[in-house]
């Protein structure tokens, strides 16, 4: 029994999100972009910090300029945009807006991004976990539909392409999503949109119960600044802006996003190389004994190795200098620089030899 009797008992067993220390050698565990900002842009941001951002003043609380810039980039209206301190804050706000107060449960298809379940549990919201197909990682539509019918599902969480498995939603899965009742919020997490180039945005106007989440942490190389955004119905956006914490984005993070969007073409110019490296890694992993690797539409690959416990393999790899994420009964390998990718393969060959 916990000595602190004011704590909720269910939180005592909740595990925090696990992350590898930043000083790790080759960090291929967090789906970060492998290259930092170009020096010229970092200098521009540094000059803004030095000359244009008063440290004694709070940042822009309403993000109006940033909303306009994001709307222009995404092809949406500023009234459809809400910003969060990472997509995690937006997920939490969406769950508060829909499920808190015993209004319903959250449906997740696992393996998937773990923060949906973690945040729901932290808010005391029931989580309905439906396993994906063990070979294809497709949704089990029969069990999903049964959960919707029987478990008071208020929110369906879908990552497209899914993390950690890298697969996008199929035609049948989209048909199921489009048939969900209007009282269920569908969160469509497009964190890897820039890599997959697939978006639900063209159909958003037909489905006011859909909301898209995106991030600047991946393709725009802004993981250190923690900025995510939602695209949704203006009334939903108004609620999100009302319940989020005040001044949730630092001034320097807001300016970093502005700079990234002003130079989006330059920042996204390396995406073809990432896709090329991903495909080369996929082919190389396929050739290794006992390795089962799945195709990916994102900047990572998911695989399993026959005869190996994923955690043991993760530890062995990390001891040699490559960090990967162990999740969902397998390993997720982020696409790094060509040099990091080559070292990762050489070390894996050494382990499996």
Curated annotation (Swiss-Prot):
Gene Ontology molecular function, alphabetical: histidinol-phosphate transaminase activity; pyridoxal phosphate binding
Protein known as: Histidinol-phosphate aminotransferase
Enzyme Commission number(s) from the entry: 2.6.1.9
Catalyzed reactions per annotation: L-histidinol phosphate + 2-oxoglutarate = 3-(imidazol-4-yl)-2-oxopropyl phosphate + L-glutamate
Keywords: Amino-acid biosynthesis, Aminotransferase, Histidine biosynthesis, Pyridoxal phosphate, Transferase
Family named by the database record: Belongs to the class-II pyridoxal-phosphate-dependent aminotransferase family. Histidinol-phosphate aminotransferase subfamily.
GO biological process: L-histidine biosynthetic process
Necessary cofactors: pyridoxal 5'-phosphate
Domain of life, source organism: Bacteria
N6-(pyridoxal phosphate)lysine: modified positions: 218
InterPro entries found in the cross-reference section: Aminotransferase_I/II_large, HisP_aminotrans, HistidinolP_aminotransfase, PyrdxlP-dep_Trfase, PyrdxlP-dep_Trfase_major, PyrdxlP-dep_Trfase_small
Keyword Transferase among record annotations: yes
Listed pathway(s): Amino-acid biosynthesis; L-histidine biosynthesis; L-histidine from 5-phospho-alpha-D-ribose 1-diphosphate: step 7/9
Quaternary state and interactors: Homodimer.
């Amino acid at each position: 029994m916990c000595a602190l009797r004011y704590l909720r008992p269910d939180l005592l067993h909740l595990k925090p999100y696990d992350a590898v220390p930043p000083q790790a050698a080759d960090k291929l565990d967090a789906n970060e972009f492998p290259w930092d900002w170009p020096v010229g842009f970092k200098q521009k941001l540094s000059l803004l910090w030095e000359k244009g951002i008063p440290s004694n003043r709070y940042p822009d609380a309403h993000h109006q300029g940033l909303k306009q810039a994001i709307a222009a980039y995404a092809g949406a209206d500023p009234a459809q945009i809400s910003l969060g301190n990472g997509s995690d804050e937006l997920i939490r706000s969406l769950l508060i807006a829909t499920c808190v107060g015993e209004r319903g449960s959250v449906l997740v298809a696992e393996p998937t991004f773990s923060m949906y379940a973690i945040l729901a549990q932290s808010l005391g919201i029931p989580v309905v976990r439906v396993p994906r197909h063990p070979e294809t990682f497709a949704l089990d539509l029969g069990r999903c539909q049964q959960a919707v019918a029987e478990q008071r599902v208020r929110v369906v969480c879908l990552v497209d392409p899914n993390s950690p498995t890298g697969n996008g939603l199929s035609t049948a899965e989209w048909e199921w999503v489009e048939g969900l009742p209007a009282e269920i919020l569908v969160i469509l997490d497009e964190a890897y949109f820039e890599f997959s180039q697939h978006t639900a945005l063209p159909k958003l106007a037909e489905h006011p119960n859909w909301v898209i989440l995106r991030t600047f942490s991946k393709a725009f190389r802004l993981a250190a600044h923690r900025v995510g955004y939602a695209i949704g119905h203006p009334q939903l956006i108004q609620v999100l802006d009302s319940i989020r914490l005040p001044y949730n984005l630092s001034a320097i993070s807001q300016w970093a996003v502005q700079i990234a969007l002003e130079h989006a073409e330059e920042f996204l110019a390396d995406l073809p190389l990432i896709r090329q490296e991903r495909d080369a890694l996929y082919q190389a992993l396929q050739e290794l004994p006992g390795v089962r690797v799945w195709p990916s539409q994102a900047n990572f690959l998911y695989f399993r190795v026959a005869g190996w416990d994923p955690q043991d393999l993760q530890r062995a790899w990390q001891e040699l200098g490559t960090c990967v994420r162990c999740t969902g009964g397998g390993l997720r390998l982020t696409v790094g620089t060509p040099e990091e990718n080559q070292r990762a393969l050489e070390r894996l060959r050494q382990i499996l030899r």
